[in-house]
Amino acid sequence: MKKLQTVRVLLNGASGKMGQAITRLIAENPQKNLIVSATRGPGQSDIKESFDIVVDFSTPQGAQEAFLLAKKYKKPFLTGTTNLPEPFLFTLQSEEKIPVFFAPNVSLSVYFFTELVKQACNMYKGYQKALHEIHHVHKKDAPSGTAKRIATEMGLPAEQVTYERLGETVGTHSATFSSALDEITLTHKATNRDLFAASVLDIATWLVKRQGGFYTMSDFAKFKLKEKKK
């Protein structure tokens, strides 16, 4: 059997919670054929080490700097950084020369939860809708990027999303549908940040094989579903 080539990751935001989780999972899962060959700090404009993909979980400014680095070296760019400026999002969505992946939440289970909420919106059109999210006290954006994404699918303005910041909560999202007769609540609760970090490893392995263009969780989910049918 032909040995798979190791994918060298340039990790932007390695000191953050997600960066640390990604680094640890790469080390714990050698069968994934990924290594962190380089890390990048704020304001660092160049990298001496070789890399095959830029993975970013940092800040809006850090994400933009990391993208320029990916463009410079013509390497795939994967980011899960939230609260990105609209002009930069448009730039990512318009990219054609390198593979670019963006998702405010990289978990497949959260993606399918969002799809379930969309179906519920179609089923309970006469119901009052509400969305509540809980994250750890260190999270800077509120509501979260994931909550904004779910709210969009529910037809709710971001201002109507309620939120809490409690302890070290990884992430909980609850969509509620209420009528005079009953109430339905759909909830996704992440209990470990490894849920997201493990998905990043799979997305990175997938993205390096893609052609130039913009990709989302929808594209990755379709790939995974096809893979399961084989």
Predicted regions, residues:
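C-terminal substrate-binding/catalytic lobe of Rossmann-fold NAD(P)-dependent oxidoreductases
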Residues: 8-12, 17-48, 61, 125-230
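Short acidic/histidine-rich motifs immediately flanking catalytic phosphotransfer sites
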Residues: 47-55, 72-77
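Short glycine-/small-residue-rich Rossmann-like dinucleotide-binding loops
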Residues: 58-59, 82
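Rossmann-fold NAD(P)-binding glycine/threonine-rich loop
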Residues: 81-101, 108-119
